[in-house]
Amino acid sequence: DGDCIPRKDFVSTHLCLRRKGRFLSGGYHKLSMDLSKDITKDDILSGRCFDLQWMRGKGMPASFKNNKLTATGFKRWALNTFTPTKASWNGHNASGWLSDILAVNGFDERMQYGGQDREFGERLENYGIHGMQIRYSTVCLHLDHARGYKTKDSIQKNRNIRKHTRGAKVQWTSLGIVKDELRGQSVKVNSYYDRYTREE
């Protein structure tokens, strides 16, 4: 997400914690609107925006959620293991294996803002790939902002799609990476950043 600031060990932690047959489910630490506007590029590059004392000095209140910034060792493991929060695919902080992503055909392009990442994770779960909670291991700050693109119609549409995905145990979307006319045909990845293309 473009409204998130990952800590410098974000990607390396995802790589370290990866497990076959699982996807990783992280979270974020949501900042107030005032603090979101106050953070500078230098605060990010220096890493001070991840320092709890610095953030408290900027007005962040005491909260259990601050453990996301400070937990280490056994405490981090315990918080990840026993959190009541379900391990879901969260667009701001999640990772999975390419083979699993292709197996469910990625995101459903019918969906707009509000739950499109969760629906993708629900299809992974239906496919047998279960989430692993790492919300206290991968630190990601979320900048608050207005959401003019959020509408009641889009939210309801997404809820209906998710309800069907869960109820019918849907694994594959026909409106994802590979469109219906290519399903069942060989697909290859030219490089990490290239689009998927049909093999000749």
Predicted regions and their residues:
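The conserved acidic donor/metal-binding loop of glycosyltransferases
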Residues: 1-5
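Conserved donor NDP-sugar-binding/catalytic core segment of glycosyltransferases
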Residues: 8-60
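Conserved nucleotide-sugar donor-binding catalytic segment
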Residues: 90, 97, 104-112
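Non-catalytic, C-terminal membrane-associated alpha-helical segments of glycosyltransferases
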Residues: 152-164, 177-200
